[in-house]
Amino acid sequence: MTEVILFTQETCGACATQREKNEGIEDAYPDVEFREVDIQTDLETAEEYGVRKTPTTLVYANGEQTAEFIGIVDRDDLEAAIESAGQQSPGLAHRLTSIIRR
């Protein structure tokens, strides 16, 4: 599974720009989970992911980080990261779980 997490904050002008660039991307990638985390209201999650600046966009494939963008990311670059993540093979934890279940 591919996941994209955008870390923002309400007073961040660049975050508003990133949201505009991301408009419609969820429709283009219906199998990807998109989340937005406001670091002012969910500091614990930001700390868990090691995020200190906004906007920060993280891309995960099968629970493993495959891309990180600090600052505004162009739509083409984000789409390339999403497509690359979608081609990642399952991570070690997933493979081990599959083996254990046998």
Cite the ranges covered by each PLM segment:
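Haloarchaeal acidic low-complexity proteome signature biased toward cell-envelope/secretome components but also
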Residues: 1-5, 27, 83-102
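Local sequence-structure signature of Cys/Sec-based thiol-disulfide redox active-site neighborhoods
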Residues: 1-29
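Thiol-based oxidoreductase modules, predominantly thioredoxin-like and allied folds used
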Residues: 7, 30-44
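Nucleotide phosphate-binding site architecture
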Residues: 13, 40, 66
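Chalcogenol-based redox active-site neighborhoods
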Residues: 24, 48-49, 75
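Structural micro-motif
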Residues: 49-58
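Non-catalytic, surface beta->alpha helical segment in thiol-disulfide oxidoreductase systems
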Residues: 58-94
